[in-house]
Amino acid sequence: MVGFEKHGLMPLFRVFSENALDAIHSASLEVLEKTGIRIHHGESILKMLKENGCIVDFGKGVVKFPSYIVEEAVKKTAKTFIMYGRNLKYDFKLDGRHVYFTTDTETTSTVDLSTGEWRPSTLDDLEKLTRVTDALESYAAGGHLTTALDKPNNVRCLYDYAAALNNTEKPCGWSVYPPELAIQLTDYQLEIATAAVGSEKKLKERPIIGGVFCTESPLQLDGRFVETSLKLAKLGFGCDVESMPLAGATAL
């Protein structure tokens, strides 16, 4: 089956059988081809997809992906990926055969250890929690466990990322918001990462930074975050697209 690398050594714990994986893959292709995905705030992305063979409704912002395009993209996608930390001893490879634990990201509330109060998280909380996860051997990565709600919203992600890098040597996640400033803030975060490792050359050799953005329910993407990820990919940095909708919580 296209898109799933076969290994000689299979994981000890498997959730899905090969038939189940085939069924999920086929159903995903069908949804992408027949229903499509809405991409808002992304006129340039829509044009790019149209030029590369996708069926685009510019009025609705809906893109339908012929299955052969998806299959070809899956073939070209790297089957392994290295997560880099500031300290190389914390590097690890994502290869489908190993499981690693990391913290969640951007939680907005914290239980105050002094008072027991449930309150909005702060930069101080983020720094302290990052140091805890840095010390715990059970976590392979972390650093963006909560967010600095005591900082201005338009630059909060910069405080978050700088705090993460200053308090862990492990791989750490990052994100950009608000979306209308995504490209500009990404440039600033690249500067922060460059300062952390010493030079642009070192950052490209060991990219401790990468794009992370989430899908929206139902079947939507914010084009501004897609543009950000494309920018990072062209620079040689990996990108992580997460399926954020949760049944019963965010799914409409």
Describe each model-derived feature in a short phrase.
Residues 120-252:
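Helix-rich catalytic cores of soluble enzyme domains
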